[in-house]
Amino acid sequence: MKIIVAGDGKVGATLTRQLTAEGYDITLIDSNKDVLSSSMEQFDIMTVHGNCATKDTLLKAGITDTDLIIAATSADEVNLLCCITAHGLNKNLHTIAPVSYTHLRAHETDSYL
């Protein structure tokens, strides 16, 4: 299974460590070149420098041949946009975008309708 992890912070690094240990083919996207270099050496994975919410970056990461993308940046809005853009490029893609702001969670919006 090919997985893209977008964001190499605490959550993304933990996911990358666990998923590579389980034998998954991981590509890591982040906007910080130094963090990516460290992860590339530590985990021996493909990395892509750029904004995970952009079409060009996702295509460089191989989104069209990917089974799952996990958007794990520190910004909920970026995570959601990343998954929406990625799904537009690969309709068979599974997406995960953790959302920490309660006002962005779908089940919370019912009280506003």
Predicted regions and their residues:
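Short alpha-helix immediately C-terminal to the canonical SAM-binding loop
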Residues: L36
